[in-house]
């Protein structure tokens, strides 16, 4: 009786309770993962494949090779998927850095996506994307022509053709082409309202930074100038990773003003604001 009431946790030699599942509808669940790709370019550098699959239809809603597998690049991959296929109800990912961070949580929360993480070191939980990874290794990576390894652009061009073909072939489990299965429920998709600008804003990163004594803040390792009046204060910023021209300071009223990277040479020749008054310590009492 005690053992029935207090089941023992699964040990290394015990199998986990895994049950096959499938989303009830298209965009009900997306699964995402990263796969090591080939070395490309000169000098050769490792490419990483980021991919997202729709659980119900098995359609690959986004796939691309990137030079760095990090939070910023995955946000870009997710943005591609949302722009072309709508907003999923859930996003199922692992615990790697690109998938477990505050910015992705904020983005998903703003879009109404439930962000779910698999148990640590339990890649098998994301069965559909893992099976697709195996298919891609056997059918795409193993037959990749040498010219496709000249750069990320060439590699992604080959990948796009292969993914388009994959989405048009009948899937072994559903007996239906992923693209066809997805299109059958196109009337149920939810897209971001407000067009491209609203989609862009939904993927803006948010941070709060303390303003240094030289009226700068640091974002992703780079300094940006802010108004002198904010020295010592906390500044809220919105920015698009990787785009220095898309960094904004949030005002007390919620308004946005663009800020620029610090130019130390320009600052050296800038006119200094004189104090409102001065004291001549050379005069006697």
Briefly describe each language-model feature range.
Residues 1-38, 123:
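Basic, flexible linker segments flanking DNA-binding modules
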Residues 33, 58, 78, 91-94, ...:
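Mobile genetic element proteins and their domesticated derivatives, centered on retroelements
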Residues 41-48, 59:
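Short, flexible loop/turn motifs enriched in small residues
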Residues 45, 63-87:
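Active-site beta-loop-alpha junctions of metal-dependent nucleic acid enzymes
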Residues 54, 66-70, 264:
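A short acidic/small-residue loop/turn micro-motif
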Residues 84-102, 119-121:
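Acidic/histidine-rich, metal-coordinating catalytic segments
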Residues 105-200, 241:
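Charged alpha-helix within mobile-element recombinases
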Residues 167-285:
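C-terminal, beta-rich DNA-binding module of retroviral/retroelements integrases
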């Amino acid at each position: 009786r005690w053992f029935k009431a207090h089941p023992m946790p699964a040990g290394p030699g015990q199998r986990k309770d895994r049950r096959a599942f499938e989303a009830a509808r298209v965009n009900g669940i997306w699964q995402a993962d990263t796969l090591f790709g080939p070395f490309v370019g000169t000098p050769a550098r490792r490419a990483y494949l980021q991919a997202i699959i729709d659980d119900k239809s098995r359609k690959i809603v986004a796939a691309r090779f990137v030079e760095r597998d990090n939070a910023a690049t995955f946000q870009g991959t997710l943005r591609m998927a949302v722009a072309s296929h709508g907003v999923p109800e859930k996003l199922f990912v692992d615990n790697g850095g690109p998938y477990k961070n505050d910015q992705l949580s904020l983005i998903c929360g703003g879009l109404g996506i439930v962000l779910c993480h698999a148990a640590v070191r339990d890649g098998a939980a994301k069965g559909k994307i893992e099976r697709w990874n195996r298919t891609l290794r056997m059918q795409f990576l193993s037959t990749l022509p040498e010219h496709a390894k000249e750069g990320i652009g060439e590699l992604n061009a080959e990948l796009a053709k292969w993914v388009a073909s994959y989405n048009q072939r009948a899937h072994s489990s559903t007996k239906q082409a992923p693209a066809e299965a997805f299109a059958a429920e196109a009337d149920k998709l939810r897209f971001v309202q407000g067009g491209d600008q609203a989609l862009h804003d939904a993927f803006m990163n948010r941070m709060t930074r303390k303003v240094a004594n030289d009226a700068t803040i640091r974002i992703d390792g780079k300094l940006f100038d802010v108004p002198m009046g904010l020295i010592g204060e906390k500044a809220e910023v919105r920015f698009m990773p990787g785009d220095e021209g898309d960094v904004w300071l949030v005002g007390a009223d919620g308004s946005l003003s663009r800020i620029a990277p610090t130019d130390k040479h320009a600052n050296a020749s800038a006119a200094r604001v004189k104090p409102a008054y001065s004291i001549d310590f050379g005069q006697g009492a």
